[in-house]
């Protein structure tokens, strides 16, 4: 399900046909981390480490941008989940339309944290 031009995964992974679907940073970073760590621990074949590294490279090439105040990480879904959540929302339905309606953020902590985890695994591969 990787997107050919970014090497990342879509917000709604299996629905490339959806208008507004985009390469999403936090989920892609978690997949990259899992692939690299799994390969390092011998739980996955070694070539999966390289696949994870390519996903992380795609994040860097697509969404890591130099801003006025330094580097910024773009393309992070603000938050998506099921059920009402802490703010008692009723729109968290789990439909593709719901997932695509959540706004994209810059430097959101769950996206940045997932990227830092993936980068730490990529550095261990070096």
Identify the meaning behind each predicted range.
Residues 1-16, 20:
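Oxyanion-binding "anion nests"
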Residues 27:
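Anionic-ligand binding region
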Residues 23, 40-126:
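CBM-like carbohydrate-recognition segments
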């Amino acid at each position: 399900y990787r997107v050919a031009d970014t090497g990342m995964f879509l917000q709604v992974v299996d629905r490339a046909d959806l208008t507004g679907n985009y390469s999403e940073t936090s989920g892609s970073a978690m997949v990259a981390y899992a692939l690299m760590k799994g390969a390092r621990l011998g739980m996955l074949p070694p070539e999966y480490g390289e696949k994870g590294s390519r996903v992380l490279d795609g994040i860097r090439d697509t969404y890591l941008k130099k801003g006025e105040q330094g580097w910024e990480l773009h393309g992070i879904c603000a938050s998506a989940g099921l059920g009402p959540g802490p703010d008692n929302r009723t729109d968290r339905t789990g439909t593709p339309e719901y997932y695509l309606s959540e706004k994209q953020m810059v430097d959101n902590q769950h996206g940045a944290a997932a990227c830092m985890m993936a980068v730490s695994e990529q550095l261990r591969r070096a």
